[in-house]
Structure formats: structure tokens, C-alpha cells
């Protein structure tokens, strides 16, 4: 195509050059014959023709340069994508049927199969091909589901079942008429009030703790004073036995003295 266009342009330029030659020769002949008005008209027409031809050639060259500069589009082929979790499960009948779906050649429409199992999701894309080119749709984001643990399904031994526990309604004793079961369950409002009054204990206000540890100097001073008082009392008050013996000796001396005087 490019060689054909260049050959066509060369032919047109050659014809224009020949026509301009003939036109110049004709103008020179008219100038020799003293026809100045006709010469001026012819020159103005020639100038207009040359300007038009130059603009046309410039447009042609610019268009051809742009076509050469544009790169040719290359065919793009995309590969089928498959998202699969790292922890794969053993194949089962359901998984095998869902993962291995048969394709329908080059004219098969776009299909999207999702297989959801415990903790995993499989995405399979079959792409539509047309004339050797495959175009894939935008790939969806795979959302991982946390694995279901067996501990949640089986309750632990520590947990207790409180379904058997029932709260009995209030039954007054006035309704019961000789029924032992009713009397065992009934309650008097006065008894319940008394029980509550007896069971309620007033809260004790804690006293502020203001204990001061005695210093060594104060304890020593107290003990020294006690020892001094104890020593003084022992020195001033003699024992009872000594006082009685002293009195007895004085009495005997007074009794013996008048005898000596009489003698």
C-alpha cells in the first residue's frame, strides 16, 4: 500500500511540473506581445494554483507520516485463572463434578462456577474465545471463610444445661384447702417479709485505722520509770515479817527492864 501511494504522488507532481512549464512559456509569449493585463491575471492564477498544490502535498505527507508512526496492534491472549485456597480438601463426588465441568469448544459462553465447602471456595472461569483471541472478565476477589471447628458443635463438659431449671410462681396459702402439695409450695406474705427482715443485716461502717507505732525512746522511758518506782517502793516498805519481829523484841526488852530495876 505504501509503494502504491508514493508512485501516485510522484506522477501527480510530474504532471503539475509539466503544466507549470507550459504555463510559463505561454506567459512569456503574451509579455512579448505587450499584453500586460493578461499577464498579470495569469500570474495571479498561477500563484493561487501553486499555493493550493503545496497545501495538498503537505497534508498528504503529514497523513502518511502519522500512519507510519502508529504501532500496529498485537493480538493479546489471556490465560484462564483459577483461585484456590492453600488448604485443599480430599476430592469428593460433589467437588469432582463442580470442579471438572466439560467445556464446549471455542463457541462456549462465559461460565462462572462457585464451589463452597468447609473453609474453602473454588472459583473456575471458562473464557469465551473468538477468532483466536480470548478475553477474560474481571476476576472476582476470593473471600476466605474461617474453618468450622468441631469444638463449637460439641459442648464442653464444663458448660451446664439449665433448661430443666424452672422458677415456680408465687402461691399464697389462702388458696390451699387441705392439699399437702399446695401447702408445701405456698408462701405467706407475712412470713416472707419476716424472713427478709430477719435475714437483712445492717452494713457495718469500717472505722478508720489510726494506729501509731511506739518509738524506741518512749518504750525505754516508760520501762525505766516503772523500774525506778518499783525500787523505791521496795526500799521504803520493808517486809511484814521484819516489822513484827522488831516489835516483839522491843516488847521483851521493856518487860525485862522493870525486873532489873526491882532487883
From Swiss-Prot:
Region annotation Disordered: residue ranges? 87-111, 127-158, 200-223, 238-263
Query: Which residues point to the Virion surface side?
Result: 67-263
Intravirion face of the membrane: 1-37
Q: Using the record, list the residue span of the signal peptide; answer none if the entry has no such feature.
A: none
Q: Which UniProt keywords apply?
A: Disulfide bond, Glycoprotein, Host-virus interaction, Membrane, Secreted, Transmembrane, Transmembrane helix, Viral attachment to host cell, Viral immunoevasion, Virion, Virus entry into host cell
Q: GO:BP terms for this protein?
A: symbiont entry into host cell; virion attachment to host cell
Per UniProt, the ranges with Basic residues bias are 213-223
Q: Where does this protein have compositionally biased stretches of type Low complexity?
A: 200-212
Assigned GO CC terms = extracellular region; host cell surface; membrane; virion membrane
Family of the protein in this entry: Belongs to the pneumoviruses glycoprotein G family.
What is the name attached to this protein's record?
Major surface glycoprotein G
Organism of origin: Ovine respiratory syncytial virus (strain WSU 83-1578)
Q: What is the lineage of its organism?
A: Viruses, Riboviria, Orthornavirae, Negarnaviricota, Haploviricotina
Gene assigned in the entry:
G
Amino acid at each position: 500500500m505504501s509503494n502504491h501511494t508514493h508512485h501516485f504522488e510522484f506522477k501527480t507532481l510530474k504532471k503539475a511540473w509539466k503544466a507549470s512549464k507550459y504555463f510559463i512559456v505561454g506567459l512569456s509569449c503574451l509579455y512579448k506581445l505587450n499584453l500586460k493585463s493578461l499577464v498579470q491575471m495569469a500570474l495571479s492564477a498561477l500563484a493561487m494554483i501553486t499555493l493550493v498544490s503545496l497545501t495538498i502535498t503537505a497534508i498528504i505527507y503529514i497523513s502518511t507520516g502519522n500512519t507510519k508512526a502508529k504501532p500496529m496492534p498485537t493480538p493479546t491472549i489471556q490465560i484462564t485463572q483459577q483461585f484456590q485456597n492453600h488448604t485443599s480438601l480430599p476430592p469428593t463426588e460433589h467437588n469432582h463434578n463442580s470442579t471438572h465441568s466439560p467445556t464446549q469448544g471455542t463457541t462456549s459462553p462465559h461460565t462462572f462456577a462457585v464451589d463452597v465447602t468447609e473453609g474453602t471456595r473454588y472459583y473456575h472461569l471458562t473464557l469465551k474465545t473468538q477468532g483466536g483471541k480470548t478475553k477474560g472478565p474481571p476476576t472476582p476477589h476470593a473471600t476466605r471463610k474461617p474453618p468450622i471447628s468441631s469444638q463449637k458443635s460439641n459442648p464442653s463438659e464444663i458448660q451446664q444445661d439449665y433448661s430443666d431449671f424452672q422458677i415456680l410462681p408465687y402461691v399464697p396459702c389462702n388458696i390451699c384447702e387441705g392439699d399437702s402439695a399446695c401447702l408445701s409450695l405456698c408462701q405467706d406474705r407475712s412470713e416472707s417479709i419476716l424472713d427478709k427482715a430477719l435475714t437483712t443485716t445492717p452494713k457495718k461502717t469500717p472505722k478508720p485505722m489510726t494506729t501509731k507505732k511506739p518509738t524506741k525512746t518512749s518504750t525505754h522511758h516508760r520501762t525505766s520509770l516503772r523500774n525506778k518506782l518499783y525500787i523505791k517502793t521496795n526500799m521504803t516498805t520493808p517486809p511484814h515479817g521484819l516489822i513484827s519481829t522488831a516489835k516483839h523484841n522491843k516488847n521483851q526488852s521493856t518487860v525485862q527492864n522493870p525486873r532489873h530495876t526491882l532487883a
